[in-house]
């Protein structure tokens, strides 16, 4: 099978959600010809993921499933769960979460795979699926081709399920709806301590560089109820401008921001983007806001300029990070869309820093930075950083079960 026949794109499978009941051959036609995603197709994907598990690293059959807040996601999750459980997977639901939370859950639960039901910064009429392996790396092209081929083969078979079994198997083996927020808060607290040990404390180094209050925009998503409160607990004077009761990604979030965007003060006040409209006047160079995308795996900052505001993109964030720890060499990766001067700057800061250029997509950053065996990073391979100008930042984190 050729990669071109794969259902997967740059970052998983995505499509406009239609919840009508269709035959499986029609479900395949819809996703291929009309970019339309149906529960029938998601069931096929679930079955295919189970059947192809032997081609993934790791052991066991646990699959962790999380999702962002889109109106069609519950039906898609039920269909995916049905497919997974029909073919022998043990399914754990962790409820609404960010994509990094799902990544963390794969490690915490020792899962063979993880599935995030999301379409990232796309409108809520869309959804899709991102797949992670037991090490937390996103699926590769060969595996995606394997899954796609299996989907096509399954659609040619008769696999009817009676109503009673369908209802039972659409529910997870283990339901942990409150797990995500608690786990993500705990994880961030650990990371905060690690960053302070590496870069110094927030109160000593950072406040004068940030507006007060500093605006946070979680795109009306998972972090909108708790992230600003977490940051305030750690000394950051900040304010969340999005709302969990509003529509995901609508008039907010990083998805509507270009890495090169700028605004005058008047343009910002007239912007339909909720966070941009609320930006406070600030001294030139001061950071005034941060926006996440819908599934929380991408971030862009906004900085005050002489005449208004400008986006601080992933390249600029990487430069800040490398400058803050220039006393040690980094393994650094950036996509082909990054500024051509970025690698030169990294090696000027520390000549022993190694730089790798990748294709577009944060998974390629992870692949470039991981060990040759595709497994865990170890202390001897740190520090590492991958960046896209769109705001994907890839950094290593201690395994949740690793000793202190």
Q: Where are each of the predicted segments found?
A:
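Short glycine-aspartate micro-motif
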Residues: 7, 112-116, 215, 287-291, ...
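Active-site flanking residues adjacent to catalytic metal/cofactor-binding acidic residues
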Residues: 10, 67, 216-219, 292-294, ...
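Flexible loop/turn segments at secondary-structure boundaries
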Residues: 16, 72-73, 101, 123-124, ...
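Gly/Ser/Thr-enriched, mixed-charge loops and adjacent short helices
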Residues: 16, 127-283
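Short beta-strand-to-turn element immediately C-terminal to the catalytic PLP-Schiff-base lysine
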Residues: 131-134, 300-304, 394-397
């Amino acid at each position: 099978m050729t990669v071109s026949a794969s259902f997967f794109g740059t970052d998983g499978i995505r499509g406009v959600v239609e919840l009508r009941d269709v035959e499986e051959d029609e479900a395949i036609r819809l996703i291929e010809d009309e970019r339309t995603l149906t529960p029938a197709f998601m069931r096929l994907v679930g079955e295919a993921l189970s059947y192809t598990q032997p081609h993934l690293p790791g052991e066991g059959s646990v699959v962790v499933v999380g999702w962002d807040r889109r109106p069609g996601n519950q039906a898609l999750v039920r269909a995916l769960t049905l497919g997974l459980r029909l073919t022998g997977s043990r399914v754990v639901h962790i409820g609404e979460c960010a994509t990094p939370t799902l990544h963390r859950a794969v490690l915490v639960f020792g899962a063979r795979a993880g599935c995030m039901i999301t379409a990232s910064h796309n409108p809520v009429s869309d959804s899709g699926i991102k797949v992670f392996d037991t090490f937390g790396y996103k699926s590769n092209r060969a595996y995606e081709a394997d899954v796609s081929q299996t989907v096509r083969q399954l659609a040619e078979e008769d696999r009817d399920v009676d109503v009673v079994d369908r209802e039972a198997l659409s529910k997870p083996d283990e339901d942990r709806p409150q797990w995500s927020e608690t786990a993500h808060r705990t994880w961030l607290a650990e990371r905060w301590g690690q960053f302070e040990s590496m870069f110094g404390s927030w109160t000593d180094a950072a406040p004068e560089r940030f507006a007060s209050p500093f605006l946070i925009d979680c795109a009306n998503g998972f972090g909108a109820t708790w992230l600003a409160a977490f940051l305030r607990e750690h000394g950051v004077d900040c304010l969340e401008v999005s709302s969990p009761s509003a529509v995901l990604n609508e008039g907010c979030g990083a998805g509507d921001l270009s890495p090169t965007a700028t605004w005058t003060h008047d343009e910002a006040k007239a912007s339909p983007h909720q966070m941009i409209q609320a930006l406070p006047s600030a001294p030139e160079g001061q950071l005034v806001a941060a926006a996440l995308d819908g599934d929380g795996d991408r971030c862009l900052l906004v900085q005050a300029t002489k005449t208004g505001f400008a986006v601080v993109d992933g390249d600029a964030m990487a430069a800040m990070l490398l400058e803050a720890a220039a006393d040690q060499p980094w393994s650094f990766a950036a996509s082909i869309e990054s500024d051509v001067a970025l690698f030169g700057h990294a090696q000027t800061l520390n000549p022993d820093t190694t730089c790798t250029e990748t294709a577009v997509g944060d998974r390629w950053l992870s692949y470039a930075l991981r060990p040759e065996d595709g497994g865990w990073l170890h202390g001897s391979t740190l520090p590492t950083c991958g960046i896209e100008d769109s705001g994907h930042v890839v950094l290593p984190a201690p395994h949740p079960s690793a000793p202190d």
